C-alpha cells in the first residue's frame, strides 16, 4: 500500500463513534433491547417515506436524493416491539438509564454537559426508521482524549435511537427489522485533529476502551460502528460510514487519501486534454444483435441502452484509484444508486460479450475519437435514463477533482458512493418529548479498563496477558465477585473465564449456554477441591450441553467427583501393566506417553500432580 507524506498533503481526519448502550429498555419506550431473528416476527407492515422541510423551509440534499429512488419499505415486528417503533404511538420520555450512562461517558471524555437537553429530529428517508427521521439529542461537548501523537478534541456527544436492522433487498424495496430500532446509542464526534492513519486508529481504540470501561455498552458485531471524516488540502471532505472493525480504520484512511490523490491527478490530466462530458443518448440500435448476456437480457425485457460520450477520458475511466476500484467503478456506483446493475465503458471493452465491432459502432454512434471514452447503461427505459444522468453528473465532478460525499466502507477497507453529504437542513425540533435537565451530581466515574488491568496484575498477581483478557472481557464482574467475594484463587477464576471458555468454543461446545450461575458453581466446586482442576472442561461441557442442570447435578451425572489415592493408584497400575514391556525397556522415558493415558482413564477425577506422583512411583517399581 502506497504511503504518502500526510503532513505535506494536509491530511485532516475526525471520527464519529456510534455505540449501542446496554440498557434494559429502549430510548423512548419500555420494549427490551433484545435482538431477534427475522423468522420470529409475528407481523409486518409497509411504508413509503418522503423528505420533509426543516424548520427553515429547506430540504436536505441527501434526503432528497434518497427519495428519488422509489422503494417500498417492509418492517418486521415482534412480540418484543410496540406501537412506538411502528410510529403509531407517541414516544415516551427519555430512558433514565440511557441518560445516566451517557453522563458517565461524558465524564470519562472530560466533556461539558448541557444544562438542558433538547430532542431533535434528524431527517432520514432511507427506510431505516419508520418515522422518516431519527430522534437525537446533544448531551455534552468540548472534551478531549490523549494519543501518542497528541490530544484529539471531542466535539460533541449525542444520545440517539438506533436505526432498524436491514434484513435484505426485496423485489419492491428493502425489508427491515424493528428489533434494533430505538436501542439507545451514543454518537461521539471528535474534532478534526487527527493527522495520520495511525492516529485515527489509536483515537478510535482509546474511545472504545473508555466506552467499555463503563460496563454498560453492548458488545459484539454491529454494536459499535465508526464513521471517519477524511480530507486532504486540495481534495474534499469525505464521510466514510459503517466501519465495523477498529483494525480497518488506518487502512481505510490510507485508501481514501490515495483515492483523492488519484482523482486530483485524473482531474489535472482531464484539464490538459480539455475534457468534456456529452449529453446522454439512446444507442440501443448498436446492440440489437448483441451476444452480451447483460445487454440482451435488458433489451429482451423492453429495455434500452443509454450511452454517454466522455471526451478526453480515454484510459482514465479504467485507472485504479483504490485497490481493485477505478474511476469507472465510481461512475458505476452512481448508476447503481438509481437501480441499474452498473455500467460498461470502453476502457474495459471489448469484454462481457461485447465485440470489437460493437465497440467501434458505439464510438461512431456518439462521435467518440481516439482520446474519448464511452459509458453505457442497459436497463428498463426509466432506470437507464436516471442512471446515465447520474453517471454524467459524476463525470462532470471528475473534471473538478474530488466531490464531497458520504461513502460506505467496504470489507477490504476501500469505499463506495452512498449519498451526498448531509447538511443542517435535515434537523428540526422534536415536539413530542419534553427536554431533559441532566443531573451530574451523583454520576460516578468508572475505573478505566487500563487501570483495571494494572490492578489485576498487582492485586491478584495475574500475568499481563491474562489480566488484560479478563479486564477487557465481558466476565470481569463475575471474576471480581468470585475472587473478592468468595476468595477463589484468581488464576483459577481468570483461566476458566478466559482460556478454558475459549478452548471449549473452538471445540464447538455451546458455551453461549453457560450463565454466570453455571460458571460460578463450577469454579467454586473446583476451588473447594470437590472436582479436580482437570475436570473443569468436562464439567463446563456438561453444563453447556444441559443448561438446565446445576453444577452439582452435572458433577453427579458425569461422575466427576474426586477419587481417593487408592483409586488413582489402581487406575495408574492398570495402565502401567498394559505397557510393562515399554516400561521395562524405557524406564522413566515412558512417562510422558503413559501420563496422557492415565489422565484419560481417570476422566478428570484426579488432579495432574497426584496422578504424576503415582505414575512415577509405579514406573520406578518396575523399571
Curated annotation (Swiss-Prot):
PROSITE patterns: GATB
EC category name: ligase
Single GO biological process annotation from the record: translation
Known catalytic reactions: L-glutamyl-tRNA(Gln) + L-glutamine + ATP + H2O = L-glutaminyl-tRNA(Gln) + L-glutamate + ADP + phosphate + H(+)
Pfam families: GAD (PF02938), GatB_N (PF02934), GatB_Yqey (PF02637)
Record's keyword terms, sorted: ATP-binding, Ligase, Nucleotide-binding, Protein biosynthesis
InterPro entries: Asn/Gln-tRNA_amidoTrfase_suB/E (IPR017959), Asn/Gln-tRNA_Trfase_suB/E_cat (IPR006075), Asn/Gln_amidotransferase (IPR018027), Asn/Gln_tRNA_amidoTrase-B-like (IPR003789), GAD-like_sf (IPR004115), GAD_dom (IPR029351), GatB_C_1 (IPR042114), GatB_Yqey_C_2 (IPR023168)
Assigned EC number: 6.3.5.-
Domain of life of the source: Archaea
GO cellular component, one term: cytoplasm
SMART domains, sorted: GatB_Yqey (SM00845)
Family recorded in the similarity comment: Belongs to the GatB/GatE family. GatE subfamily.
HAMAP family, per the entry: GatE
Name of the protein: Glutamyl-tRNA(Gln) amidotransferase subunit E
Organism, scientific name: Haloarcula marismortui (strain ATCC 43049 / DSM 3752 / JCM 8966 / VKM B-1809) (Halobacterium marismortui)
Gene: gatE
